Structures are given as structure tokens and as C-alpha cells.
């Protein structure tokens, strides 16, 4: 199996349908020798902030000298981003070797009357297999959706269960109330494990506290209100937390301080599990953390920023950041969304800050909302909206509309940010070549 064949196989598997529950992933991992049982995990669930929190925790653990596996969902640029050790993505060779083994087991499962595992179940099993093969000291694991019935929740060796910000998303699968969604997310907690949760909205907070109490878990609340002397910035942010003074992060967004506080509490909880993490590792890890597509600056003049905000909770955080960082700035949006998201709420929370909104259709996604349909929704509340036919056109038009000191903000779905990153890289390369000819 080569890489192209591997991708074709995964695409084909995506057409087989889904059976809820953990039976398929449990059987697949059993046939693989239950690699997850030989690993230790930090398991992260939440509506928003999972990826950034994973990045902070992983970076700190790496700085402390540990061999750290990372399992990420969704990817932004390239498939192999899903599975990483340290800063290295799984190689095409290892990916193909693992998938070849797993495919044989999947075929045998179907012959034995089991449902074929889904792409996410296969990827999760592949990650477990790979991390065991490479002898990771610890794995930082991000749920795909929810928690209780997520394929990642097969694990039983959780050191710390982490709950990032919980809000309304995936209601079709997780329920229509914050309590129901929180119950799914809190389902990653295992009896007696450490639980670290961000301070949640009251309804979700009650569920988290009740779950931890029922399972005999030690619960720590990471409350950003306890961060002192916070200095916000687009390129650097500093804060004090507990005994740590002047911690520094380079990820932008006021909400990133809350994610960093959560990560600090997680590594302190790991200390209670026997992991040795010095203050110098916490500082170095936080400072060196990078994460694609979270208020990420791609260009200075005009200021071109991409952000993965795609639901109500994330849109509220984005609006807060816009208000804080870009007061009195002229702002142009490039906005693309998926049909199953809370499109009306995202529009309501963000439209007032934009002078001009360009809508796009996220490419190669069956759930994509067409640019013209999104423009119709935006037009109900905002007069200056234009649907454009491609991401290339959106990038070019936004630059024609923007002055040197204006802001171009691209958001609405993580699914197309990788394309935007490549388009901007191509644009900058072309610009540098033109400068070189002068």
C-alpha cells in the first residue's frame, strides 16, 4: 500500500456508514493486541480550545524531556498532522504500514459479522498502534466529537481527563441542552483519575462536578479569573498564575490565556501522577507553543488573520478578540461555513464588526454551505456582503478592498483554512519574486 492507495482506502471507508458506540473500535484494537493498554494518556474533550490546550500541554511535556504522542482532530493542512510524536508527523511509510495491518483486521472483522470500522475509528487505532511502536512516554489525545461514545474513549489508562470550554455544537449527536452536551464531554472521566476542567457555564459546571464526584475523581478547576497581571497582545501575551510569574505565550486571542491556564493545571496534576515537570519546562513549553489557524497572522499590511471559529462559543470568543485588538480598524471578512453549524448565531455575533463580508464555499466538503446561501443569510443583517466563487478570488478581492492598515479576517470553518494558508504562501512567494526583480 502506498500513500495514494492509503488515502483512497480511507475515502472508500468513509462511504460505509456509522454504527454508534465503541464496539467496532474495541474489536479492532483487540485484534491489534490492545496497543492503547500499553500507553498513558492525557485525554481532552470540549467544544472549543481542545487543540490549543493539547498544543500547550504537549509542548510543556516535550520541554520536560518526555516522548510525547499527539492525536489531533481535525487537521488543517495535511492528513499526517493527525498523528505526531513531538513535532514530527507520522511518515507516509509508517502510515501505510499501519493501515495495511489495520485493513487486514477490518476485512476479517467484516467476514466475522462485525460492522466495518469508520475512518475515525481506524485513525484512532492507527494512532494507538503507532504510539506503542514508537514507545511514547505519554500521549495527549483529543476527542473527535463528544467524549462518552467517542472512539478515543476506549482507553482505560487516563492520567488526567481534561475538559476545555463546553458550549453548543454537534447538537444532532450530543443533545440540545448544555447539560446533555456536558455529560457527553465529561464521559471521558475514568474512575479515580485526575480531572482538570476549565471554569464552565453554570449548567455544564454542575455536570462536571457531579461526574467527578460519582467517579471518585480529584477535580481541579482552572479558572482564568485567577490569572493576574495579564497583558494581552497579538504577538505576545503574559500573565501570572499561582506561583508562576510572567508566563508568556505567543498565541493570540484573549481566550488563549484561559487555555494556557488550563494546560498549567494539567501539568501540575501530572506532577501528582509522578511526572517531573520543572518550572523551566512550563515556561519554555508555553512560550514555544504554536498552533495553526487560531488568530494566526499570515500578513502584516494589511493584517491578514485566519481563525477556526465555527460555532457559537468560538464566535463569541472571536468577537471578544476583535473588539479588544481591532477597535476602530476597518475589517473585511472572508467567511465560509458548514451547513450543520449554528450559522445564524455566528453571523449575529460577528457581523457588526465588519465593513465588508465576502462569503465562500468551503471546497471538497459535502457539508459545505454554498457561498450564495451564506450571503443570503448575512444580507438579512448586513448590507455589504458579496458571494465569491472561489477561495482564490476571495483572497484577491479582499486585498483589493483592503488598505495597508486594514484587517482581513478569514473564519467560519477549520475545513478550508489549509487552502487559505497555501494561497497566502503562494501570494507572498510571488510578491517576493517581484521585489527581487526590481
Protein language model regions, located:
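ATP-dependent carboxylate-amine ligase catalytic core
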Residues: 29, 34-37, 63-156, 202
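Beta-strand->loop->alpha-helix junctions that form or flank phosphate-binding loops
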Residues: 72, 198-199, 211-233, 249-254, ...
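Short, flexible loop segments at boundaries between secondary-structure elements
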Residues: 362-365, 431-438
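Hydrophobic alpha-helical packing residues
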Residues: 57-62, 131, 350, 378
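C-terminal helical cap/extension that packs against the catalytic core
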Residues: 198-220, 235, 303-306, 312, ...
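Nucleotide phosphate-binding/pyrophosphate-handling subdomain across enzymes
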Residues: 38, 133, 138-141, 149-162, ...
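Short functional linear segments
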Residues: 1-46, 53-66, 70-72, 107-114
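Extended acidic/charged loop-beta regions that coordinate divalent cations
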Residues: 123-173, 205-246
Amino acid at each position: 500500500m502506498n500513500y495514494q492507495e492509503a488515502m483512497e482506502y480511507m475515502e472508500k471507508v468513509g462511504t460505509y456508514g456509522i454504527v454508534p458506540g465503541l464496539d467496532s473500535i474495541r474489536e479492532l484494537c483487540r485484534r491489534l493486541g490492545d496497543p492503547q493498554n500499553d500507553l498513558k494518556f492525557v485525554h481532552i474533550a470540549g467544544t472549543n480550545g481542545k487543540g490549543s490546550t493539547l498544543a500547550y500541554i504537549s509542548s510543556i511535556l516535550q520541554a520536560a524531556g518526555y516522548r510525547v504522542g499527539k492525536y489531533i482532530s481535525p487537521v488543517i493542512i495535511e492528513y499526517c498532522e493527525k498523528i505526531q510524536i513531538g513535532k514530527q508527523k507520522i511518515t507516509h511509510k509508517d502510515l501505510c504500514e499501519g493501515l495495511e495491518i489495520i485493513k487486514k483486521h477490518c476485512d476479517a472483522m467484516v467476514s466475522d459479522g462485525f460492522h466495518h470500522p469508520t475512518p475515525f475509528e481506524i485513525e484512532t487505532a492507527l494512532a494507538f498502534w503507532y504510539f506503542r511502536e514508537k514507545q511514547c512516554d505519554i500521549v495527549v489525545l483529543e476527542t473527535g466529537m463528544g467524549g462518552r461514545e467517542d472512539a478515543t474513549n476506549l482507553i482505560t489508562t487516563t492520567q488526567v481527563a481534561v475538559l476545555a470550554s463546553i458550549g453548543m455544537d454537534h447538537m444532532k449527536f450530543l443533545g440540545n441542552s448544555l447539560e446533555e452536551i456536558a455529560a457527553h464531554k465529561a464521559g471521558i472521566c475514568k474512575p479515580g483519575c485526575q480531572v482538570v476542567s476549565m471554569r464552565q457555564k453554570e449548567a455544564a459546571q454542575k455536570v462536571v462536578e457531579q461526574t467527578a464526584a460519582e467517579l471518585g475523581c480529584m477535580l481541579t478547576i482552572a479558572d482564568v479569573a485567577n490569572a493576574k497581571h495579564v497583558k494581552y497582545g497579538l504577538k505576545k501575551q503574559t500573565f501570572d498564575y499561582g506561583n508562576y510569574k510572567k508566563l508568556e505565550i505567543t498565541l493570540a486571542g484573549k481566550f488563549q490565556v484561559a487555555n494556557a491556564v488550563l494546560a498549567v493545571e494539567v501539568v501540575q496534576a501530572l506532577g501528582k501522577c509522578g511526572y517531573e515537570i520543572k518550572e523551566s519546562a512550563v515556561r519554555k513549553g508555553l512560550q514555544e507553543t504554536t498552533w495553526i489557524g487560531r488568530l494566526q497572522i499570515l500578513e502584516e499590511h494589511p493584517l491578514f488573520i485566519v481563525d477556526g471559529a465555527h460555532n457559537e462559543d468560538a464566535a463569541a470568543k472571536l468577537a471578544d478578540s476583535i473588539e479588544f485588538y481591532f477597535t476602530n480598524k476597518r475589517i473585511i471578512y472572508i467567511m465560509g461555513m458548514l451547513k450543520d453549524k449554528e450559522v445564524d448565531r455566528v453571523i449575529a455575533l460577528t457581523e457588526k464588526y465588519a465593513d465588508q463580508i465576502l462569503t465562500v464555499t468551503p471546497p471538497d466538503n459535502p457539508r459545505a454551505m454554498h457561498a450564495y446561501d451564506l450571503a443570503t443569510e448575512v444580507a438579512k443583517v448586513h448590507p455589504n456582503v458579496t458571494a465569491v466563487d472561489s477561495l482564490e478570488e476571495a483572497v484577491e478581492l479582499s486585498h483589493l478592498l483592503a488598505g495597508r492598515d486594514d484587517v482581513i479576517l478569514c473564519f467560519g470553518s477549520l475545513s478550508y483554512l489549509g487552502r487559505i494558508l497555501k494561497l497566502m504562501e503562494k501570494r507572498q512567494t510571488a510578491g517576493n519574486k517581484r521585489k527581487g526583480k526590481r
